[in-house]
Design a protein with these regions (language model features):
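C-terminal (or distal) subdomains of carbohydrate-active enzymes
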Residues: 1-391
Length: 391
């Protein structure tokens, strides 16, 4: 695009390209005959124990059950797998009340046989290595594609399950080599911290908590996280993150959950403290995939943010149909500081607003840029007047 050759490869899943897309923007790709053959960006090798994957960031080993037995960051050589990651746990699940709502704490005492008849197969490498895993759990069958992309520290588990259970609970466990007394669970515009232990009586009822795009365990030197695109229940038990994948309630509808389910979750790790990691960005990337449409436009970016922790979450038209644009930003890591918002629209004026988009304070646009102070977890809404530019 824009005269630059990009890494493109035909795979069993279609043509894939490695492209840098500007924030809140677009690029145009045109066909081009490749002159030079590049080395594989992700190598994959079959071993006696399973399959080994490696790119510029990580080395990963996956056994014949589709479990991750090793996840090493190459920058430090640190091993993050305390035990097998992506290990399925299958439980009997019969709540005393509210069948489709509650999970009782005694489910751990009723574990059943997990995955069986598991087969693994290497189906692609190059721009992205892909391992296909098939198997059975109870009366159900599943297919999982484990993906590691070029220059990525995110190992994705693209999963489809034909769920045929009743009163059953399925989790996947990620025991990591991180000591943390509290785990981090993302919520709307921030996160909450919850204990990973059960030392106090009231914490025994926190065996299942909610999260949005990620949950993380970290100390002052390193950390790891489980990301997801649609699964919001998770357990944090000592050093293990256990994501709830599926349940099978009998009420109010006997077989409401018996269907084919598709979802993706992922594992990532980093060196350094939580404030400096990119787990929020990784969570957005997993959930907000690029959209492909036919057409041709110059490369552009509507707006971007210069800050390690402030996120531009929303760009939308104003509710009053005035033609103004609304930008909503938030501080994501409990780290107060300044943020520069670079605007690539011809905005004439800008205001800080309340959440209902009512103007509160005019702010100065200087050289196409706004500069704002953010408190920890602060949400700020900006209104841009672009009427003259559009006229």
């Amino acid at each position: 695009f824009e005269g630059e050759e990009v890494f493109v490869e035909k795979t069993p899943f279609g043509v894939k390209a490695w492209v840098t897309i500007p924030p809140c923007g677009a690029v145009t790709l045109v066909p081009y005959k490749k002159k030079n053959v590049e080395q594989k960006a992700v190598s994959a090798e079959k071993t006696t124990d399973g399959i080994a994957l490696e790119n510029s960031q990580v080395r990963v080993k996956i056994n014949k059950k589709g479990e991750v037995t090793s996840f090493v960051l190459k920058e430090s050589g640190r091993e993050f797998a305390a035990d097998a990651l992506n290990c399925f746990h299958f439980y009997k699940d019969v709540p005393r009340m509210f069948d489709a709502w509650d999970i009782d704490s005694n489910y751990r005492e009723q574990e059943l046989e997990g995955a069986f008849d598991v087969c693994t197969e290497l189906v692609a490498d190059g721009i992205e290595a892909v391992i296909k895993v098939t198997g059975k759990i109870g009366n159900s069958s599943y297919t999982q594609y484990i993906r590691l992309a070029k220059d990525s520290r995110r190992l994705e588990f693209d999963t489809t399950i034909d769920w045929k259970e009743l009163h059953r609970l399925l989790k996947t466990s990620f025991p990591v080599a991180v000591y943390a007394e509290n785990g981090i669970n993302e919520m709307q515009f921030g996160y909450v911290m919850r204990p990973t232990h059960r030392s106090r009586e009231y914490e025994k009822d926190r065996f299942e908590v909610c999260n949005h795009r990620y949950s993380a365990l970290c100390d002052a030197s390193h950390g790891a996280a489980v990301l997801n695109d649609c699964k919001y229940g998770i357990s944090m038990n000592q050093n293990a993150l256990e994501l709830t994948l599926l349940r099978a309630a009998a009420a109010p509808e006997m077989r409401a959950d018996n269907q084919v389910h598709h979802f993706t979750y992922a594992f990532t790790a980093w060196e350094g403290d939580f404030a400096g990691c990119d787990v929020v960005k990784q969570g957005y990337e997993l959930n907000e995939k690029p959209r492909l449409v036919p057409g041709c436009v110059p490369t552009f970016s509507m707006a971007s943010v210069k800050s390690g922790t402030v996120v531009l979450d929303t760009i939308k038209p104003a509710l009053d149909r005035s033609g103004d644009l609304i930008l909503r930003l938030y501080e994501s890591k409990k780290a107060a500081g300044k943020a520069q918002i670079l605007l690539n629209v011809d905005a004439k004026k800008a205001w800080l607003c309340d959440m209902l988009e009512n103007k509160e304070q005019e702010i100065v646009i200087k050289d196409g840029m706004l500069e704002l102070e953010f408190g920890a977890f602060q949400i700020q809404t900006i209104r841009l007047s672009i009427e003259e530019a559009m006229a």
